[in-house]
Each structure stands twice: as structure tokens, then as C-alpha cells.
């Protein structure tokens, strides 16, 4: 078995893993693992945008929108941190080179589901790709960070309830151990387990399963976020995502009777429920979306 050592091992090369790598002291050796190409993370697939506190007067509204969307089961202090740090993080992303849309020389904002007002920054309809590819380019230039592609974590190295790194295997099933003082899981969810998903198929919840096996505390694992709208297909595998900002900018949903059946900017779980109810009512595997209001150029 090949043995490697690092100060920190980060499992996952999406936005969170890359952002973590960028905040590690430069004298610390970092190894990042990904099951596929570094570009094949769900962070690359996000279309609509990223929310940010527009100004101090927006805090209460932003807080209420977020808590309501989470059925008030959110960890309040985490929501506060997310909101209060959002502007600094956006400025940091811009500093790395992320190009958000502007209007009249100022940042432009759109609206997405569950938000009562526009507070979403975006880059065309490929915001995730813009953010994550920019971060990846910066990380790849760091001398203290090594990215290992097509390497799958199989377990953690644990003794006396302490984590000392991870066990992994490469594309040829060659086993390796990576000993590290700190281990960061940033490896996504379980979308790849579903027949129909907007996620990459290799996202199979490995870290969640390993955490359960080792008694690592998890929270709200029964909550799976479902994106309400994809382009209908009978084929299995990754579906084409229709961005939430499409509805935020005015696209409407209709049943087979040609009538609207819901507010299109409801929180994702409720929007998904409304669509499923309409599909059952219509005895159809899909509903209709009219986005002509956006205009041919935008579409």
C-alpha cells in the first residue's frame, strides 16, 4: 500500500473544498482528492447564482427568507454567519477573478425561489462554473497543494476516536493511505444514487456513509434538497437543469389544462411538492414551463 503524508487532506474539489484550500497557511502541505476530474463537481453545474446581503437594511428580510425556507429548523447562528459574511466572501471571490454580472457599473442582482427580493449575483447562466473554475485555477497554482484525480476515499484512518487521515484507492484499485493532521470532508451529497438527478453520478454520499460508520455526528441527513425543474427526459442519468432564476425572472408553470398551479418562486421543497401534485392530478410525467416572457435573446 502506498503511503502519503500531508498536514491536511481535503476530500472533494468543489467550491467548498477549493475555498478551504485557499485559506490554509502556505507552509502547510495539502492533498486534495476527487473521484473524477477536478472539474466534475456539482459546484460547476450550478447555474442561477449566489446570494449576498445587499446592505445592512436587507438583513432582517434575508434572515426571514432563509429561516422560512428551512421551516425554521435552521441553525440560527449558522444562518447569521452565512448572511453577515456573504459580502466579504463575494469581495474575496471577485479578488480571485470571479466575474459577476454588472449593470451601469454596479453588481447586478436577480431573484430566485424563497427570496422576497433580488439578492442573487450571477455570471450568465453558468455561475457555478465561473466561480469554481476560477477557484480551481488559483488553487492549481499553489505550491503547497496537490490535487489527486480519480482517487476515491474508502475510509478514514481512526484510532481512539481520533482521525489521522484517509484510506483511498485510485482508478486501478491500487490502495493508499494518506496520513494527515486534519481531514476535511467537502465531497458533496447523494444525488448520484437517484435514477434522475442533476448531479454527477459519482456523488454517492461516501463521506456520509463513512461518518455514520465511525460515529461522527451528522445533522439533518434525512433532508435532501431537490431542484424543482429539469428538462423532461425518459433517459436515466444526469438531467439538464433549468435554473431557478428562470422562474425568478418570470417564467410560469402550467398543468395540462393550461392553468398555473403555484407561485413559481416558492421554496424548493414546496415547489417540488406542487409540481408532483400537479403531475399526479394530470396523470403526466411532467408539467409545462413557459419562459417566453424572458425573450428569445435571454433564452
Where are these regions (language model features)?
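Core beta-strand elements of the Rossmann-like FAD/NAD(P) dinucleotide-binding domain
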Residues: 3-6, 173-182
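N-terminal Rossmann-like FAD-binding beta1-loop-alpha1 element of flavoenzymes
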Residues: 8-32
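Residue-level detector of alpha-helix initiation sites
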Residues: 14-15, 37, 126, 190-191
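Glycine-rich FAD pyrophosphate-binding loop
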Residues: 25-50
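An anion/pyrophosphate-binding glycine-rich loop and adjacent beta-alpha core
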Residues: 38, 210, 216-299
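Glycine-rich active-site loop/strand segments that organize a redox cofactor
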Residues: 51-82
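Conserved redox-cofactor binding core of oxidoreductases
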Residues: 95-174, 186, 230-233, 253
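Glycine-/small-residue-rich beta->alpha transition segments that form the dinucleotide
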Residues: 180-182, 186-191
Amino acid at each position: 500500500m502506498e503511503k502519503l503524508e500531508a498536514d491536511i487532506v481535503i476530500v472533494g474539489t468543489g467550491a467548498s473544498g477549493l475555498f478551504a484550500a485557499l485559506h490554509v497557511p502556505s507552509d502547510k502541505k495539502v492533498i486534495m482528492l476527487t473521484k473524477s476530474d477536478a472539474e466534475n463537481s456539482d459546484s460547476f453545474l450550478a447555474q442561477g447564482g449566489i446570494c449576498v446581503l445587499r446592505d445592512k437594511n436587507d438583513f432582517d428580510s434575508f434572515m426571514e427568507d432563509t429561516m422560512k425556507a428551512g421551516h425554521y429548523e435552521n441553525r440560527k447562528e449558522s444562518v447569521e454567519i452565512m448572511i453577515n459574511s456573504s459580502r466579504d466572501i463575494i469581495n474575496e471571490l471577485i479578488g480571485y477573478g470571479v466575474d459577476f454580472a454588472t449593470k451601469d457599473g454596479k453588481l447586478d442582482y436577480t431573484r430566485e425561489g424563497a427570496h422576497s427580493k433580488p439578492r442573487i449575483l450571477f455570471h450568465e447562466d453558468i455561475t457555478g462554473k465561473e466561480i469554481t473554475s476560477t477557484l480551481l485555477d488559483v488553487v492549481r497554482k499553489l505550491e503547497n497543494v496537490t490535487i489527486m484525480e480519480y482517487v476515491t476515499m474508502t475510509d478514514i484512518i481512526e484510532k481512539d476516536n481520533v482521525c489521522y487521515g484517509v484510506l483511498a484507492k485510485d482508478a486501478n484499485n491500487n490502495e493508499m493511505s494518506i496520513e494527515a493532521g486534519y481531514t476535511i470532508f467537502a465531497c458533496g451529497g447523494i444525488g448520484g444514487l437517484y435514477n434522475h438527478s442533476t448531479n454527477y453520478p459519482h456523488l454517492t454520499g461516501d463521506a456520509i456513509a463513512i461518518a455514520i460508520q465511525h460515529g461522527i455526528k451528522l445533522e439533518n441527513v434525512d433532508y435532501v434538497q431537490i431542484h424543482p425543474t429539469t428538462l423532461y427526459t425518459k433517459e436515466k442519468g444526469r438531467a439538464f437543469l433549468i435554473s431557478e432564476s428562470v422562474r425568478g425572472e418570470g417564467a410560469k408553470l402550467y398543468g395540462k389544462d393550461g392553468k398555473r398551479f403555484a407561485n413559481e418562486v416558492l421554496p424548493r421543497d414546496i415547489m417540488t411538492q406542487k409540481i408532483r401534485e400537479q403531475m399526479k392530478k394530470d396523470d403526466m410525467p411532467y408539467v409545462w414551463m413557459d419562459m417566453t416572457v424572458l425573450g428569445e435573446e435571454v433564452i
